[in-house]
C-alpha cells in the first residue's frame, strides 16, 4: 500500500517509520524535500521511505495521512492538488501556541475533522491517529503499526 504522510514531524515521522518497517511504500510530503529535517528522517528510517512535495506524494498515494501542525493544515491540504476520491486519515489536532501556552483553536462549535473535510472537498476524511502522543504511535506495541 502506498501511504503519503503529509508532514514529517513527530507524528508523521513515527507513523511513517512504523509503516515503512512493515513494508509499506511510505512517501513523506513536505514543503521542501531537500531540507535537512526531511533527509535526516529518511536516513533514520534506513532508506525504506521517500520524500517529495505535498502535491507529488498526494497524487501517487492510495491513502493520505495528514499530520501537520494545525496552523499549517489548510495550506497543506490546498497544496495537495486534486484529491477527489482520495482517502485522508486526519491525525491533526486544532491546537495553537499562544502567550498562555497551548490552546484549542476550534472545537467549540465545529470540529477539526469538519474543517478538514471542508478544505478537502471531494476526499473522504476520517479522523484518526490523533489521540495518542507521538511517542506511542510507533514500535511493535502500536496496533496501527501492524497494518
Explain the meaning of each model-derived region.
Residues 1, 86, 147:
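Nucleotide donor/acceptor-binding cores
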Residues 16-18, 39-40, 76-81, 100-101, ...:
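Short amphipathic alpha-helical segments
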Residues 1-44:
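NAD(P)+-binding Rossmann beta1-loop-alpha1 motif at the extreme N-terminus of oxidoreductases
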Residues 92-143:
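Rossmann-fold NAD(P)-binding glycine/threonine-rich loop
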Residues 43-47, 83, 106-107, 142-145:
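Short, hinge-like loop/turn segments at secondary-structure boundaries
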Residues 45-100, 119:
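Rossmann-like NAD(P)-binding element
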Amino acid at each position: 500500500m502506498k501511504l503519503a504522510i503529509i508532514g514529517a514531524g513527530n507524528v508523521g515521522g513515527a507513523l511513517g517509520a512504523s509503516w515503512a518497517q512493515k513494508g509499506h511504500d511510505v512517501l513523506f510530503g513536505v514543503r521542501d524535500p531537500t531540507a535537512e529535517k526531511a533527509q535526516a528522517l529518511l536516513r533514520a528510517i534506513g532508506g525504506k521511505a521517500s520524500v517529495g512535495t505535498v502535491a507529488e506524494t498526494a497524487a501517487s498515494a492510495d491513502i493520505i495521512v495528514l499530520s501537520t501542525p494545525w496552523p499549517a493544515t489548510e495550506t497543506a491540504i490546498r497544496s495537495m492538488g486534486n484529491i477527489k476520491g482520495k482517502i485522508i486519515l486526519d491525525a491533526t489536532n486544532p491546537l495553537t501556541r499562544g502567550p498562555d501556552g497551548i490552546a484549542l483553536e476550534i472545537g467549540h462549535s465545529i470540529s477539526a475533522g469538519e474543517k478538514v473535510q471542508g478544505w478537502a472537498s471531494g476526499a473522504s476524511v476520517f479522523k484518526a491517529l490523533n489521540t495518542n502522543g507521538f511517542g506511542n504511535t510507533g514500535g511493535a506495541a502500536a496496533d496501527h503499526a501492524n497494518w
